[in-house]
From Swiss-Prot:
Protein name, as recorded: Non-selective voltage-gated ion channel VDAC1
PANTHER family in the record: VOLTAGE-DEPENDENT ANION-SELECTIVE CHANNEL, VOLTAGE-DEPENDENT ANION-SELECTIVE CHANNEL PROTEIN 1
Catalysed conversion reaction: chloride(in) = chloride(out); K(+)(in) = K(+)(out); ATP(in) = ATP(out); Ca(2+)(in) = Ca(2+)(out)
Entry comment on modification after translation: Phosphorylation at Ser-206 by NEK1 promotes the closed conformational state preventing excessive mitochondrial membrane permeability and subsequent apoptotic cell death after injury. Phosphorylation by the AKT-GSK3B axis stabilizes the protein probably by preventing ubiquitin-mediated proteasomal degradation.
MF terms (GO), sorted A to Z: ATP binding; ceramide binding; cholesterol binding; identical protein binding; oxysterol binding; phosphatidylcholine binding; porin activity; protein kinase binding
Role: Non-selective voltage-gated ion channel that mediates the transport of anions and cations through the mitochondrion outer membrane and plasma membrane. The channel at the outer mitochondrial membrane allows diffusion of small hydrophilic molecules; in the plasma membrane it is involved in cell volume regulation and apoptosis. It adopts an open conformation at low or zero membrane potential and a closed conformation at potentials above 30-40 mV. The open state has a weak anion selectivity whereas the closed state is cation-selective.
InterPro entries: Porin_dom_sf, Porin_Euk, Porin_Euk/Tom40
Transmembrane regions: 39-46, 52-61, 67-77, 82-89, 93-101, 108-117, 123-132, 136-145, 149-158, 162-171, 178-188, 191-198, 202-211, 215-223, 230-239, 244-251, 255-264, 268-276, 286-296
UniProt-annotated binding residues for ATP: K25, K33
Pfam families per the UniProt record, alphabetical: Porin_3
Record remark: domains: Consists mainly of a membrane-spanning beta-barrel formed by 19 beta-strands. The helical N-terminus folds back into the pore opening and plays a role in voltage-gated channel activity.
Annotated positions of the Phosphotyrosine modification: Y80
Stored PROSITE patterns: EUKARYOTIC_PORIN
Length: 296
């Protein structure tokens, strides 16, 4: 009897692999989070007593002076595994999303996503399905377009830290596969390796290393078949203290990104960032960014 419960416990603790879109995510986060070049951004997140979540975001591009904004409300009906989401942005696009998870079957997630633009009359609807269990993560999305539905499928298998994934897109209007991607990787709590091939022409790879509790590093590499130009970058994130972190990255084009995030007080976070051209430091044209995030 004891051995039965031990086997059951080990089985339940087996890792569920990430979705195909999340493969290599840790390395991407080191390269992207904590930066906002050329933007002045304001984010506000609040949650009411009944569980209704409000998220609003606004940004201004310092070069084009264009202002963008969005508003999102989300309500979770935990008892029935339901999540209702309403979205709006300054392009006057309205969106509705309904998700049900772990109700029809354990690990199964169903989402109905629709959007409508009153200005153009454009409508869009998607049905997304996802299923995850030990060693496997499946996804299938159907995008209903005027030209004809398109089907995107993805599969990720995992075993003892090793990951292998495949993603494809089939357009019914063309009756052919228009995208075919493959990825292989290895993942532990402190180290991640990710490689991918997109459509047999684009190749990429990344390495993520958590050196210690304060320091995270990442390297990425990409190139295209028939093009000798290889894209290369390194990045690091250092947690100075519980309320502050510093980020830096550089690529083979000598573009240097710097970011600093400071928690001013609980629920208020300030982010400063700069993008410098290492080849023309004195020429100007560098980009600065400022972000404020409020959460209550």
């Amino acid at each position: 009897m004891c051995s039965f419960f031990l086997v059951l416990l080990l089985w339940q603790n087996m890792a569920v692999p990430p979705t195909y879109a999340d493969l290599g995510k840790s390395a991407r986060d080191v390269f992207t989070k904590g930066y906002g070049f050329g933007l002045i951004k304001l984010d506000l997140k609040t949650k009411s007593e009944n569980g209704l979540e409000f998220t609003s975001s606004g940004s201004a591009n310092t070069e084009t002076t264009k202002v963008n904004g969005s508003l999102e409300t989300k309500y979770r009906w935990t008892e029935y595994g339901l999540t209702f989401t309403e979205k709006w942005n300054t392009d006057n696009t309205l969106g509705t999303e309904i998700t049900v998870e772990d109700q029809l079957a354990r690990g199964l997630k169903l989402t109905f996503d629709s959007s409508f633009s009153p200005n153009t009359g454009k409508k869009n609807a998607k049905i997304k399905t996802g299923y995850k269990r030990e060693h496997i993560n499946l996804g299938c999305d159907v995008d209903f377009d005027i030209a004809g539905p398109s089907i995107r499928g993805a599969l990720v298998l995992g075993y003892e830290g090793w990951l292998a994934g495949y993603q494809m897109n089939f357009e019914t209007s063309k009756s052919r596969v228009t995208q075919s991607n493959f990825a292989v990787g290895y993942k532990t709590d402190e180290f991640q390796l990710h490689t991918n091939v997109n459509d047999g022409t684009e190749f990429g790879g990344s390495i993520y290393q958590k050196v210690n509790k304060k320091l995270e590093t990442a390297v990425n590499l990409a190139w295209t078949a028939g093009n000798s130009n290889t894209r290369f970058g390194i990045a690091a994130k250092y947690q100075v203290d519980p309320d502050a972190c510093f980020s830096a990255k550089v690529n083979n084009s000598s573009l240097i990104g710097l970011g600093y995030t400071q928690t001013l007080k609980p629920g208020i976070k300030l982010t400063l960032s700069a993008l410098l051209d290492g080849k023309n430091v004195n020429a100007g044209g560098h980009k600065l960014g400022l972000g404020l995030e409020f959460q209550a």
